[in-house]
Amino acid sequence: MLRPNKIHQRTVREIIENSICRIFRWPYLWAANIFMALGLFNLRRNVEYCLSAMPDNLEYIPDTFVSVLVISEDHRSLIHFGVDPVAIARAIVSTIFLCKQGGSTIEQQFVRITLADHEQTFNRKLREQLTATLLSRRANRCAIAKAYLEKAYYGTNFNGLHALERSYGKNLCDMSLDEIVEITARLKYPQPLRESTILRAKFQRRCGWIKMRLGRLPVVADGVVRQLGTAA
């Protein structure tokens, strides 16, 4: 149970983060629309391609998968606009201090794997951010998260959720919360062909961290998905 001062600190932090996302929302939208109107970065084509890559039927993926994904990979998903300026700032600071840390949202990760664009350049990153911004305005955020989960790489011979269903020998709707946590943790630490003791320990720590986050935010099970369904 969180102490009152911890709750207050979290509330203040959330207010600040919400304000930062609101401040950056419109500049990103303006830039994305201007770039698209000028035909730069092939934004229109990229957005349409990403939309067409989203399957029509994603109901077979339980909402719990999305909830765990949001908590572990993109906990500000309810307040950002497809790009998380807070995470970007944190990633820049971490890079300066030689501690690499990701700042990509679920929308950005979906754009990246859909377009198969992994160039380590500023232009690629900007193109990805602008595409994610426009995509989040066109598509249901929960559907984007499920489409990402369906296409994501989870390790050797584990491309997409259907491969995981075969591996676990059960449907997604029959999987336990512990199994969903393990699957989500594989997004950061994909299953290698041969797993070393060090990699196994990192994977287990990741699972423990996700479970801790779920324990601290018990309302995630339904609330996150319900709100994501209407976010734009």
Outline where the language-model segments fall:
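Juxtamembrane regions of bacterial inner-membrane/periplasmic proteins
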Residues: M1-A232
